Swiss-Prot record:
Belongs to the protein kinase superfamily. AGC Ser/Thr protein kinase family. PKC subfamily. It is found in: Cytoplasm; Cytoplasm, Cytoskeleton. This is Protein kinase C-like 3. Keywords: ATP-binding, Cytoplasm, Cytoskeleton, Developmental protein, Differentiation, Fertilization, Gastrulation, Gonadal differentiation, Kinase, Magnesium, Metal-binding, Nucleotide-binding, Phosphoprotein, Serine/threonine-protein kinase, Transferase, Zinc, Zinc-finger. Required for the normal progression of embryogenesis and viability of the organism. Plays an indispensable role in establishing embryonic polarity and in recruiting and maintaining par-6 to the periphery, through interaction with par-3. Required for epithelial cell polarity in the distal spermatheca. Phosphorylates serine residues of num-1. Required for the expression of antimicrobial peptide nlp-29 in response in response to fungal infection or physical injury. The keyword Glycoprotein does not apply. Residues 181-238 are annotated as: Disordered. Residues 12-95 form the PB1 domain.
Length: 597
């Protein structure tokens, strides 16, 4: 069997190998010989030559099939050719099961559910371990010399030698990892008068190499226009001692109280000392970004925060900064709490209340979709209520960017109760999953419970995530008789298990928006132009005495002290700080307002 680093040919077999939380993608030329095949997998998984491994491939029905003999390997390749699949999906486990038929160490049924775990994907070629990176700086591909930036131009960077190429070019690399590249793989300033399109705008900015040498990550750099006299030029102006005029740090804020906490971050209410403005600060420890957790979702969240900053129904960004141990997002503080807290007080909402909230949510989702963003995490907890009673969506870490009309993605993600059937089936999906989640949320608002409530099941085996997914996929949704015909029909429209028939799911997203606006549940009840201008009076006005009022936040958070734990020097020493280059950001509109105070 030829090495996976050989020249690309149509007959090469793509091996997508999952091992210990990573996906290693490599290529081999048939015929595949069992001993060579196992040696190749051991090398890709960094196991020594005599280490016992168990190898299983996934057939077209999603079932794992062991490969222990040449005959079984040949059968896997034959099935791959018959099915015309693009790749052979393989799982590798260390050791052998104690008895035939028993699972291997680390093997359970969730391992084989498509996308059910977050896998860190690495492409192995010529000794390089390429990983997808958002290279927003103007960096030239080592192979084709074109710039690596923008939609359809995903960058790959070797995690060892930092060589950068387009995804489409990585199999043309002839330089072995560790050799000195002889190419233009450094950030390059554009020629005079020549710009690049960033986010649909002309960018005439220049790029610089890092003072420490090497290739700048560029993953976090902003998309704004840089022109003489622009707000961004002002943001980078300096005072007499050379410090940035608008530099933001933890010293600029007084931490007041914890207002939320999630798996990856906590959110603290804070006062901007100079202006006494109140903000929320989302704090993420850098140490969580290890081999099992990639930084891409933080990059995505920052990018979406920037896009959302001036839209009325989305939480916007004030600034970003970092310390050696943490990342900080300074965002709008929304004092009315979230819909989850509101629902806990009200139990269920009148239809006119649900109509108002869902109308504003529709506009927020359409705004994201029009910018190529799938939200993917709509739930009661992520819908905030401002001081006047309008909603704002927050938490963009689950978003998927760069989705155009007709584009699809396949990552398994979301909050279990809101995950759309197409995700559970392992199908590729688009904006449809957000409209399904809206249907679930509207059901919760008007019925006071989830359409898939499994709490209290007698059989403990039924009270599980897998059983919940089975219900979402198979069980017919029963609409409460207490709801009006209009409400019942719109819930049926959004909760259609077939995304092609689901309300709002048209190839042209504007056609989908019009279908929702013209539905009986909304038609004649909402002036959509006035709604988008926040000129429609909210049905509920939270009693907020001041911007420091925490009445609408759960005491399990607000009773917690906001202090940050002391830094651990040993932990900090293990953090690759270059991964966070360019994370800092200030919103020019916010900062110019503060200058005028």
């Amino acid at each position: 069997m030829s090495s996976p680093t050989s020249v690309e040919e149509d007959g090469d077999i793509k091996l997508k190998t999952r091992f210990h939380g990573q996906v290693v993608v490599l290529y081999a030329r048939p015929p595949l010989i069992l001993d060579d095949f196992f040696a190749l997998l051991r090398d890709a998984c960094k196991q020594h030559a005599k280490q016992d491994i168990t190898v299983k491939w996934i057939d077209e029905d999603g079932d794992p099939i062991s490969i222990d003999s040449q005959m079984e390997l040949d059968e896997a390749v034959r099935c791959l050719n018959v099915s015309q699949e693009a790749e052979l999906n393989i799982h590798v486990f260390v050791g052998k099961p104690e008895l035939p038929g028993l699972p291997c160490q680390g093997e359970d049924k969730t391992v084989y559910r498509r996308g059910a775990r977050r896998w860190k994907k690495i492409y192995l070629y010529n000794g390089h371990r390429f990983q997808g990176k958002r290279l927003n700086r103007r960096i030239q591909c080592f192979i084709c010399h074109d710039y690596i930036w923008g939609i359809g131009r995903q960058g790959f960077r070797c995690v060892d030698c930092r060589l950068c190429v387009h995804k489409k070019c990585h199999r043309h690399v002839r330089t072995h990892c560790g050799q000195t590249p002889q190419g233009p793989n450094v950030p390059v300033a554009p020629s005079s008068g020549v710009g690049s399109l960033r986010g649909g705008r002309l960018d005439t900015s220049s790029s610089t190499t890092r003072s420490g040498g090497g290739i700048d990550n560029g993953a976090f750099h902003e998309h704004e226009i840089e022109s003489p006299g622009s707000a961004k030029d002002m943001s980078r102006s300096t005072n007499g001692n050379g410090a940035s005029k608008w530099a933001v740090s933890l010293n600029d804020f007084r931490l007041l109280t914890v207002i939320g906490r999630g798996s990856y971050a906590k959110v603290v209410q804070a006062e901007h000392i100079a202006t006494r403005q109140i903000y929320a600060i989302k704090i993420i420890k850098k140490e969580m970004f290890n081999e099992d957790e990639d930084i891409d979702w933080v990059q995505t969240e920052k990018s979406v925060f920037e896009a959302a900053s001036n839209y009325p129904f989305l939480v916007g960004l004030h600034s970003c900064f970092q310390t050696e141990s943490r990342l900080f997002f300074v965002i709008e503080f929304v004092p009315g709490g979230d819909l989850m807290f509101h629902m806990q007080q009200q139990r269920r909402l009148p239809e006119e209340h649900a109509r108002f909230y869902s109308g504003e949510i529709i506009l927020a989702l359409h705004f994201l979709h029009s910018r190529g963003i799938i939200y993917r995490d709509l739930k009661l907890d992520n819908v905030l209520i401002d001081a006047e009673g309008h909603i704002k969506l927050t938490d963009y870490g689950m978003c998927k960017e760069n989705i155009n009309a007709g584009d699809l993605t396949s990552t398994f993600c979301g909050t279990p109760n809101y995950i759309a059937p197409e995700i559970l089936r392992g199908d590729e999906y688009g904006f449809s999953v957000d409209w399904w989640a809206l249907g679930v949320l509207m059901f919760e608002m008007m019925a006071g419970r989830s359409p898939f409530d499994i709490v209290g099941m007698q059989n403990s085996e039924e009270n599980t995530e897998d059983y919940l997914f089975q219900i979402i996929l198979e069980r017919q949704i029963r609409i409460p008789r207490s709801l009006s015909v209009r409400a019942s029909n719109i819930l049926k429209g959004f909760l259609n298990k077939d995304p092609s028939q689901r309300l709002g799911c048209k190839l042209d997203i504007n056609d989908g928006l019009n279908d929702m606006k013209e539905h009986d549940f909304f038609r004649g009840f909402i002036d959509w132009e006035a709604l988008e201008q926040k000129a429609v009076a909210p049905p509920y006005h939270p009693a907020v005495e001041s911007d420091r009022d925490l009445t609408h936040f759960d005491h399990q958070f607000t009773d917690e002290p906001p202090q940050l734990s002391p830094d651990n020097s040993a932990v900090i020493a293990r953090i690759d700080q270059s991964e966070f280059d360019g994370f800092e950001y200030v919103n020019p509109l916010q900062m110019s307002r503060e200058d005028s105070v």
